[in-house]
Amino acid sequence: MAFLRAIGAEARYLTQRAYSSAAPTTKLFIDGKFVESKTKEWIDVHDPATNKVVTRVPKATQDEMQTALESNKKAFRSWSNQSILTRQAVMFKLQALIKENMGELAKNITKEQGKTLADAEGDVLRGLQVVEHCCSIPSLQMGETVANVARDMDTYSLVMPLGVTAGIAPFNFPAMIPLWMFPVAITTGNTMLLKPSERVPGATMLLMELLNEAGCPPGVVNVIHGQHDAVNFICDAPAIKAVSFVGSDQAGKYIYERAGKNGKRVQSNMGAKNHGVILSDANKENTLNQLAGAAFGAAGQRCMALSTAVFVGDAQGWIPDLVERAQKLKVNAGHVPGTDVGPVISAASRQRINDLIESGVKEGAKLILDGRKISVPGFEDGYFVGPTILSDVTPSMKCYTEEIFGPVLVILKADNLDDAIDIVNANPYGNGTAVFTTNGAAARKFVNEIDAGQVGVNVPIPVPLPMFSFTGTRGSFRGDHHFYGKQGIKFYTQTKTVTQLWRETDVNHTQAAVAMPTMK
């Protein structure tokens, strides 16, 4: 198939569910070419549904990372001078190619990450929307002008690229998060060194093939693989001016501090504990269905998953009905038709999830739905956890204070809306939250008083479309400018202000002016 021609026939493993005793290797992408790494250190990537190795990812050597960076630096000199219409044209082509190949991208995501095919297509689609927004770059990157700020003097601002930027992406959205990063970076005239998660490299590599086909010049985006050494290289390299990161708290704080100390601009999206507040006047059927989907979809591995529910007053009587809906969700391999909940990413992740469930039980929570011992016929070696619900949870319990990142919903109870708002605001995270109600006054009170960056009213996962920005706050984000939207443009650009004077009289100065200019 033409889609994979540049990577080579051996790359068909990226989208086909076939395994071999000698797993193929994932390439680096440097200067427009897919390059075999010379490293001696490799990381196995497992299909979460089968535990079989699908590819081996290199830990790029220092020389390889430096080569990629030099390619980015060289490409910036020419790419930043291309017309904005040329950069826009690449986005138009990339957008069309992603649409055309969405199914192939989704197959790879399901194979490496585990989520259902429908959810994987959503992963690609939400990233595609950022590409579509970047097609408006001539309007998004406009500066400002004030004519005649003084006699014969004009001042205007230019929105300029930074230089070489870097992106460090997580495992849970193999296509969406890289597409939050490199399209905005390169359309504004930067180049990017991208490090996808070593657990799910395939989607990024397929996107690089599409980027080549879209006509993006060599070196504008390069891809390296690795773990700590690759992260440190990105944080320390003087040529890299800005770093985008999405992932865990520990990594996000480390990258923000290390890169920041080296003078880099950083945006760091980290952990979350998103609450859904359910009032008794809500539409019961819609609310419970939305809760189940938002809590257990993608096996709970979304930074905007509703992992916590606060039932207010009489709505607490709906909890058994929620359990009934969760029990009906089908747990299976992501590529199997009808699957609602796929596996989690790894055996270690499954163990951590199970340990947090057990900690809740030991601390006094009620385990009203237990998915720990689920077995999926034909996929007994997969990393499965079924939908799990812990009720009567208190804010001091470990299952509440830590991000579980699995198909686990913890339930708290509140007597009234004020108490529910206090619970949400006392949590250190501020990624997102939602309220379910038919009362406009209650919804308005919630929106005004809640301390979270993204708020849904009868919308369980309020991730904004890219004409807005992804605006997590408090413990969920570090940095000054958020991802995509207007803030994303600001993150990847800097302002150059020009003041020019052309005297109408064109009279030559007869002597130097040493007094402070007053702009009159």
From Swiss-Prot:
One of its GO terms (cellular component) is mitochondrion. GO terms for biological process: thymine catabolic process; thymine metabolic process; valine catabolic process; valine metabolic process. It catalyses: 2-methyl-3-oxopropanoate + NAD(+) + CoA + H2O = propanoyl-CoA + hydrogencarbonate + NADH + H(+); 3-oxopropanoate + NAD(+) + CoA + H2O = hydrogencarbonate + acetyl-CoA + NADH + H(+). NAD(+) binds at A169, F171, K195, E198, R199, S248, E403. The active site is at C303. Belongs to the aldehyde dehydrogenase family. Homotetramer. This is Probable methylmalonate-semialdehyde/malonate-semialdehyde dehydrogenase [acylating], mitochondrial. The lineage of its organism: Eukaryota, Metazoa, Ecdysozoa, Arthropoda, Hexapoda.
